């Protein structure tokens, strides 16, 4: 073995998707400076999947469209190496860190894999239950209800003990799941120090329900928001995947006095609000952690049981440590799991400051464009 081969740095491919997933993977990679880290939008190598991708039918999914454009822009801005579909650098990777296990290509299944929970999973529908009974792939549930439940990855990093139990109950081996917390949702107190110019309002954070092939009565939702707000200022923050022109038009029609933000840091807006209204959005967990009164299409009491652990922002370091130990482990996956114990650090919101190596997704970090 040559000297160059002996000391060659190991390579890790981070699979990204939404803005939140992209920034989470960046934070984890930043904790692994001794490895060559590359990034790729989630992709398919199957001929049928590639054909569907070319038709444009996946434009509103994390495979393509605005999600991929934003991810590519983020990678370029932060000078991260983009190896989309392993087609640019063509490396043989030692490990893949996954943002989803709903779809994992065959070649990635042949190497070590670590799955990281992004945030909230979608509700389990009747069709989702039937798809599982029929033995269909998890993505056939047509939402993210089974993300983290395919049992495909070698290791799973969960946001909380509540989510760990959910993943286990839906199919993932208990010994694979580690409660690490998840970046962006592990230190809500950090968002209290912000430059958002408004305070004391009711914030409504929308979801991309219609854009992901589901139905929604948006006018009814807007009217509910107006009723909850009462005499207080109502602010809408639109989901980044929404049809913004349509959403803005609807809000102006049914809540003419509301302010509308299509961009900006949602977490900062939550930190300054009095009350938070959500649909199917993970940001509800920021409101819960900060003690806000929250509304959600999910049962709020159940959400409190699932809420991500608050560990002062060390989730990325904990996940990176797990990756480091696993990639360097020379035994089998089963041997690694037998020798590794789950370690979760949960501390008070105000006890510890977040690491300086924190990367929150925004095209204009800390900058808030005028409300529409």
Specify the residue positions occupied by each region the protein language model found.
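A donor-sugar binding/catalytic signature common to diverse glycosyltransferases
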Residues: 263-308
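Active-site regions of enzymes building and remodeling cell-envelope glycoconjugates
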Residues: 35, 54-61, 109-116, 251-260, ...
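Short loop/helix-cap segments at secondary-structure boundaries that form the rim of catalytic
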Residues: 89-90, 104-110, 167-171, 196, ...
């Amino acid at each position: 073995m040559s000297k160059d081969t002996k000391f060659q740095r190991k390579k890790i491919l981070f699979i990204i998707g939404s803005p939140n997933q992209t920034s989470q993977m960046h934070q984890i990679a930043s904790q692994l400076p001794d490895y060559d880290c590359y990034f790729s939008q989630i992709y398919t190598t199957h001929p049928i999947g590639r054909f569907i991708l070319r038709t444009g039918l996946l434009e509103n999914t994390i495979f393509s469209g605005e999600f991929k454009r934003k991810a590519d822009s983020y990678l370029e801005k932060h000078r991260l190496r983009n190896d989309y579909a392993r087609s640019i650098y063509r490396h043989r990777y030692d490990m893949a860190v996954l943002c989803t296990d709903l779809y994992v290509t065959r070649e990635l299944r042949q190497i070590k894999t670590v799955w990281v929970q992004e945030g909230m999973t979608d509700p389990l529908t009747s069709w989702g239950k039937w798809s599982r009974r029929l033995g269909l792939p998890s993505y056939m549930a047509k939402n993210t209800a089974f993300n983290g439940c395919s049992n495909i990855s070698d290791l799973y990093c969960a946001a909380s003990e509540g989510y760990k139990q959910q993943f286990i109950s839906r199919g993932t081996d208990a010994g694979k799941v580690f409660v690490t917390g998840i970046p962006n949702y592990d230190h809500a107190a950090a968002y209290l120090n912000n430059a958002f110019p408004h305070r004391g309002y009711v914030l409504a954070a929308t979801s991309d329900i219609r854009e992901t092939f589901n139905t929604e009565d948006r006018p009814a939702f807007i009217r509910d928001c107006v009723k909850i707000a009462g005499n207080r200022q109502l602010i809408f923050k639109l989901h980044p995947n929404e049809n913004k022109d349509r959403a803005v038009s609807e809000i102006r029609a049914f809540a003419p006095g509301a302010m509308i933000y299509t961009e900006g840091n949602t977490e900062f807006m939550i930190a300054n609000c009095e009350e938070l209204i959500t649909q199917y959005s993970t940001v509800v967990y920021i409101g819960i952690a900060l003690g806000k009164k929250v509304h959600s299409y999910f049962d709020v009491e159940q959400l409190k049981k699932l809420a991500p652990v608050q560990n002062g922002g060390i989730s990325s370091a904990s996940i990176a440590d797990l990756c480091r130990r696993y990639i360097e482990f020379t035994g089998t996956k089963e041997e690694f799991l037998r020798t590794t114990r789950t370690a979760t650090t949960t501390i008070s919101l105000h006890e510890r400051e977040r690491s300086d190596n924190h990367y929150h997704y925004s095209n204009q970090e800390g900058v808030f464009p005028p409300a529409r």
